[in-house]
Amino acid sequence: MTDNIVKGLGCLFSFIFLMVSCAGTDLTETQVDGAYKGKPVSDILIIAVTGNEHNRRSYERKFVANLKSVGVEAVASEKSISMPGDLKIKKETILSAVDQYKNDAVIITQLVGKETKDVYQRGGVTRYGYFGYTRNPGYSNTTKKVRLETNLYDAKTGELIWSGISKTLSKDSTDRIMNDVIKTVIANLKKNKLIAPK
């Protein structure tokens, strides 16, 4: 009986570990301009390129809040830049917003890939003791795989300072995914000493 319980717990912990290891956000690609000689940026215009205005506002505001929490000034572009139907923002429009807010950098994030999968996990029977058993019901869950590209530009020169592609595999809400991506990007920018408190 004890052996069966131990085996059952082992399977349970293995399952939990698998679920945890499959969640979260990773930067699968990053590129830093080695020729960039400017100082770390400290006042950033945030632009989320999407046709979904709710997601845009939410993402930009979360990014601003997270940057401010580490001492970096930031502003969302939602009030100064209208999103075109083709999602192609003109350079002049961005520069006008930069001039309005006096930013020294621009961060632009856009979706480059998304998959949603519904997975059904069949139930089973766990046996214990001599004749005892329990039946585990099946369940279904939805897993999202989201890939976002985030670029950091020098506001004065338009030079690309840093670029990263994040991959998030999660069953969490869109808001949780946004938070994961933002925190991962900021951590990498700090690691590369590209942002600093103003």
PLM regions and their residue ranges:
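Generic marker of residues within folded, mature protein domains
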Residues: 5, 12, 36, 99, ...
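Surface-exposed short loop/turn segments
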Residues: 88-152, 156
